[in-house]
Amino acid sequence: MARRQDEQRGGAPLIAEGKSDAEVKLILYHWTHSFSSQKVRLVIAEKALKCEEHDVSLPLSEHNEPWFMRLNSTGEVPVLIHGENIICEATQIIDYLEQTFLDEKTPRLMPDKGSMYYPRVQHYRELLDSLPMDAYTHGCILHPELTVDSMIPAYATTRIRSQIGNTESELKKLAEENPDLQEAYIAKQKRLKSKLLDHDNVKYLKKILDELEKVLDQVETELQRRNEETPEEGRQPWLCGESFTLADVSLAVTLHRLKFLGFARRNWGNGKRPNLETYYERVLKRKTFNKVLGHVNNILISAVLPTAFRVAKKRAPKVLGTTLVVGLLAGMGYFAFMLFRKRLGSMILALRPRPNYF
């Protein structure tokens, strides 16, 4: 549910009298590679809404900074500001956008409640949104043996384990430094600790991956129904019908994340769930999807480089001017390039012609 702000925060404008919802600026605080943020940004793109976006870097712990915790006491992205309204949590933001922008020029992603398609879209949206994506993400990093062709580098396992300890210490320190946010920081610390205990449990991970397969079986069956309902000369359908809906937003972003994590080959391809495979290939060609999420092979490099620039900007002493900034950027850029080159090298080796001795 949207809440009102008593004063301007983060540069958010108060609603001006006489202005329509469409005329009031939308401001989104997000992280480009956050799963929840991607769903919201895809909805904004599909609805062709104008929105001012601010990247809140999770690797740099910007979501734990006091200014952001005052926007959202859970310290999680995304957060949407629309005039005096502050809306947190992806599902609530998406519902707010769908219920607020009702003019004829703005595409609707949810059928009318009286429509035969409404319960179908709502069912698959709720089913897909209930998947524990944070557990899949942390789990594949902590236990890469459960994945195949994961695009997350091996060093990340050690890195995330050390970062967990650092984050707990950081939250404790922030709680002491900001008495007004003490409860919020302590609550976040407890949630983090509880989640990561589960996410580091192999038995739990195997259980939720088995449950994921059952969900994807339902999706595969639904996609097959769409194919059977559609005449040969008809338009190719989406998950719940001819239109791209909120159920498709959830499914498209989920499949893209599973591909990045290394769970794609386990769930589709090589004759397994062919409708799901065809659906994902079609989604990749969708203009709005490419604009928001891009190619799966570019996710790692597009996460590293902006973070490198932010680190350089934050740490560079002003007295030394641009020389140090350029140096830091070059160093961090080189680090990102080396990560990219390592993956590219393996691709080149695979394509290199083998000598023929016969």
Curated annotation (Swiss-Prot):
One of its GO terms (cellular component) is cytosol. The modification N6-acetyllysine is found at residue 203. Ubiquitinated by PRKN during mitophagy, leading to its degradation and enhancement of mitophagy. Deubiquitinated by USP30. One of its GO terms (biological process) is mitochondrial fusion. Signal peptide: none annotated. Keywords: Acetylation, Coiled coil, Cytoplasm, Isopeptide bond, Membrane, Mitochondrion, Mitochondrion outer membrane, Transmembrane, Transmembrane helix, Ubl conjugation. The chain crosses the membrane at residues 292-312, 320-340. Residues 24-105 form the GST N-terminal domain. Residues 320-358 are annotated as: Required for mitochondrial localization. Regulates the mitochondrial network by promoting mitochondrial fission. This is Ganglioside-induced differentiation-associated protein 1. It comes from Bos taurus (Bovine). The lineage of its organism: Eukaryota, Metazoa, Chordata, Craniata, Vertebrata.
